[in-house]
Curated annotation (Swiss-Prot):
The keyword Lyase does not apply. Keywords: Ribonucleoprotein, Ribosomal protein. It comes from Thermococcus kodakarensis (strain ATCC BAA-918 / JCM 12380 / KOD1) (Pyrococcus kodakaraensis (strain KOD1)). PANTHER family: 40S RIBOSOMAL PROTEIN SA. GO terms for cellular component: cytosolic small ribosomal subunit. This is Small ribosomal subunit protein uS2.
Amino acid sequence: MEEYLVPLDQYLAAGVHIGTQQKTKDMKKFIYRVRQDGLYVLDVRKTDERLRVAGKFLAKFDPESILAVSVRLYGQRPVKKFGEVTGAKAIPGRFLPGTMTNPQVKNFIEPDVLIVTDPRADHQALKEAVEIGIPIVALVDTENFLSYVDIAIPTNNKGRKALALIYWILAREVLYNRKEIESREDFKIPVEDFEMRIIRT
């Protein structure tokens, strides 16, 4: 078997495999087991596989035609950093209705592919992507549905460390598949740069 994109321990330490206590029929194929406390655990091998697939897929697009969004707080820095590193556009925070469908909207954009951090939280962006007929790459947890999702990356899509690691790997895969870096080891940006800072008051 091919090695993981990062050591298995790194995936587990970031909590990538930790799902929720709900599961949908759509996500059944990505679930490894259910814990005694009722929490569903995701199959990290499938996360790893899907990150490879998504990286190859996204590398085919012009960087500025990729849009990554996250309404979820812990996904906002990861999508912003993903944008900086890959040249993609990023909308961290609230997604204004009409951003992709109404040319009158101030920051109107016409992407060719959309990345959502959570199909449920990012439902407005998802809806507009469906309307304009562009492919959708989504980070999906055990309680998500896969309607309209073209490439699903099964992961904890709520955790701060999990989201940082997933977007870090995805950024590295995009650059690697574009041949902008010769090997994955050439990606020198620390994963911490993708992590949402917590400001204690």
